[in-house]
Each structure stands twice: as structure tokens, then as C-alpha cells.
Swiss-Prot record:
GO molecular function: RNA binding
InterPro entries named among the record's database cross-references: SmpB, SsrA-bd_prot, SsrA-bd_prot_CS
Pfam families per UniProt: SmpB
Annotated coiled-coil segments of the chain: none
Family matches, as CDD domains: SmpB (cd09294)
GO cellular component: cytosol
An annotated GO BP: trans-translation
Protein name: SsrA-binding protein
Family: Belongs to the SmpB family.
Amino acid sequence: MVKKNSSKAAPATIARNKRATFEYRFEEKMEAGLSLMGWEVKSIRMGKVNLSDCYVFLKNGEAFMHGCTIIPLNTASTHVVCDPLRLKKLLLSRKELDKLAGLVERQGYSIIPISMYWRKGAWVKVEIGLGKGKKDHDKREDTKAREWEVEKARVMKKEKTHG
């Protein structure tokens, strides 16, 4: 019997903001949809996205992503002006927007895009993180912990092969 593909397959990652986890400590993550133009979807399919200097801000009860660079393809339509740094509206429920607004305004949190991925093969989604910026000593501690994990794995592997 042939096994059918699971409908809950892992989403295909388009882009990841690697600096986000280094610069911020996230307390909560959520998924948001994106309002995109046709040429942006084509460019995203080709992988021409950069999330490195990207952040989310709230204005008039809506969330917008700023700094997300989507490089237009050479074959993009000529009758549309392609702006690589156009603001992208995030599609969130009113409940989620109110929660984000409260935490950002009252407690000084930042909203940062962590990754962009395909959901069900057709919808572009963004994983956003709600967190606070790390101090320099926090970054050093994280680096030390990460290096220790690598060293520990190396020693365990060496013990396993020689022991």
C-alpha cells in the first residue's frame, strides 16, 4: 500500500534572519501572513529575499514589516514599479494585534521577523518573535554556551570511538 503524504509536512523555509536570535531574546513567537504583490511572490519563489535588517512596527492598529528586501526579477512586469523595500502589511487577527500593541508600548518589547516560509505550498508566512534586545554580556554568555556544547559533543564522540 502506498503511504499518502502527510498534510502536516514541515514548511519550506524561504529565508531566515540569523542575526535575530543573536541580537534578541524571544519570549513568544507567532505566525503572520503577508500581503504581497505578484512580482514579490515571483521573486520569493526564486529565493531573492533578505530579512537581516528587518523589523515590525505597529501603526493605526495594523502591523507592517519594514526593511525586508525583495529583489525584483529582471523579467518582472514593466507596467508595475518594483520597490524592493516596500512596506509589507502583516495579516494578523485583531486579538493578536492588540496583544502585540500592549506589550510593545507598555513593556518595551520589539517585534522581529525570524523566518519566512511557505505554508501549504502557496501561502507565504512570516514567523515573528516578540522579545527584548540582548546586552553584550548576554551575547557572550550565549556564545560560550554554544561553544561548550560543540566541545562537549566533540569529546563525547572521541570517547565513543576510543572507548
